[in-house]
């Protein structure tokens, strides 16, 4: 893919995913097809959180200025990016209201009211909402937005530091599983002190590598210790009758997972969607030969009815040429296409096309369900393997910390450069010298490295 940026912007439009033409920088519109991809992706993470004893909640979008400012270190991290509501109609407000940049302060304000004794803990809640950041950098659709239209944030409170640390590991495992299901390989790093989440003890982050060699952060997990709990007075009575503050964690993902699915699995023909998030997993296209139209259409409807309760299937009965239909669904990344014409029907055969490999082959109609089950699994595995190979090809390991060598490697090979961990060079000054981002410390093949990359 020679020009990834151009390809990416084109595919958002031509595949019907996202419309950039909304008259406000950094804001766009999820089109129906893109919205379905989003829906199925976030249904997966919602199910995983529900299964791990998280409860979904919903907090207000508006945050009073005095509440947002209560945690000074936290707000310093993004105070220049906050949108403010200053009027109600034409009347100036006594207290400005922030449009939710993130929800620690309102959620923890409410947690104070809910937590009294140790038996009130743990609390594990999440919400999937929009959030707002006045991005001053170059905005990119689904990558860097002023209105993040899909922000999944989870917040937990525990009675001991050990429980909070265990929750961090649980969150990391949930995200690892989720990204694997989406076919998105990641590099997990502990962010450096100067780049951790404001107010956190430490931050773990998931990055992936796009086809242009730049990395993008697609998920974070934070151990907050007791920092926010002390600020917001999340105090509880211990089993011994004493007092202690809650230990907290939070973790989030956003629309960037949709951008990653698009970027990592696409090709020059268009999208290649994992079956789990494909709006239509199977497309049925009848080949209508003159005088035999009814035969093919009736069989197509019969197959559609037999599959619709098992798969997300669409019968494309548009009055256009089959070749145009083929191109449309290859562009949109539908995993499987079933073609059938009069001759196929006579021979009890169906022609199958799989988008990920471009293979076309015939199967017996009587064995359709078994073939599809096997095929779905094969497509998911192949998509994952190809993405893993792409990302791995962008990882370079160096045995030294030479600044010029690192710069040259980033320029020629792009991607992520791993250098041996050395606390003496693990500094902001080193980051400035190499003119790239230090992602953090990364375990790779059993060794500890400093990971470095150009980022979005």
Curated annotation (Swiss-Prot):
Where in or outside the cell it occurs: the entry states: Cytoplasm
Q: Which UniProt keywords apply?
A: Aminoacyl-tRNA synthetase, ATP-binding, Cytoplasm, Ligase, Nucleotide-binding, Protein biosynthesis
Catalysed reaction(s) here are: tRNA(Pro) + L-proline + ATP = L-prolyl-tRNA(Pro) + AMP + diphosphate
Q: Which InterPro entries match?
A: aa-tRNA-synt_IIb, aa-tRNA-synth_II, aa-tRNA-synth_II/BPL/LPL, Anticodon-bd, Anticodon-bd_dom_sf, Pro-tRNA-ligase_IIa, Pro-tRNA-ligase_IIa_arc-type, Pro-tRNA_synth_II
GO cellular component terms listed in the entry, alphabetical order: aminoacyl-tRNA synthetase multienzyme complex; cytoplasm
Q: Which domain of life is it from?
A: Archaea
Principal location listed in the UniProt entry: cytoplasm
**Keyword set includes ATP-binding:** yes
**Is Nucleotide-binding included in the keywords of this UniProt record?**
yes
Q: What PROSITE patterns does the entry give?
A: AA_TRNA_LIGASE_II
Q: Name one GO molecular function term.
A: ATP binding
EC nos: 6.1.1.15
Q: Which GO terms describe its biological process?
A: prolyl-tRNA aminoacylation
Q: What class of enzyme is it?
A: ligase
Read off the Pfam families from this record. HGTP_anticodon, ProRS-C_2, tRNA-synt_2b
Q: What is known of its domains?
A: Consists of three domains: the N-terminal catalytic domain, the anticodon-binding domain and the C-terminal extension.
Query: What's the family?
Result: Belongs to the class-II aminoacyl-tRNA synthetase family. ProS type 3 subfamily.
Quaternary structure annotation from Swiss-Prot or TrEMBL: Homodimer.
Record function comment = Catalyzes the attachment of proline to tRNA(Pro) in a two-step reaction: proline is first activated by ATP to form Pro-AMP and then transferred to the acceptor end of tRNA(Pro).
This protein is called what? Proline--tRNA ligase
Q: What is the lineage of its organism?
A: Archaea, Methanobacteriati, Methanobacteriota, Methanomada group, Methanococci
**What gene does this protein come from?**
proS
